């Protein structure tokens, strides 16, 4: 049942790609009275990736942060270096995800029960897609969340 994704890698400036992804959502966030802050702290974050798929993955994370903001979005998108690795992070201060749901969010078609948030559209494919794309590029995805406090999703790539 698993369709193979076509991956066409080229050298990409990840800071620039993440900046472009964030720009796609700037107007939406501003119109909602929120903030979308970008911090690019990773130097020389050049990587061989499929730019279309990786851009879609980052856009998906930002889109989720907006959808589950529970009001005015307050989002931080960043790149960072740590020992031996680069990170791409998307942090929100929204409704958060319960411990139980956190175990399932990367499964295909799983959608977090959102209580009274009936306006959240989607098919439950987003984080499953993000995880697949990141893993196809040799990276990993980590999610940390606290109910009613917000969610942080980090993509990590080991330095090449």
Task: Please provide the spans of the model-predicted regions.
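Short conserved segment of the HATPase_c
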Residues: 97-109
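Conserved micro-motifs of the catalytic ATP-binding
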Residues: 2-7, 46-49
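Short beta-strand/loop element within the Bergerat-fold HATPase_c
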Residues: 72-84
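Short alpha-helical Gxxx[C/S/T] motif in the catalytic ATP-binding
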Residues: 126, 130
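Short helix-loop "hinge" at the ATP-lid/N-box region of the Bergerat-fold HATPase_c
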Residues: 65-66
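Conserved glycine-rich
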Residues: 34, 138-139
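Conserved catalytic submotifs in the C-terminal HATPase_c
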Residues: 8-13, 30, 35-45
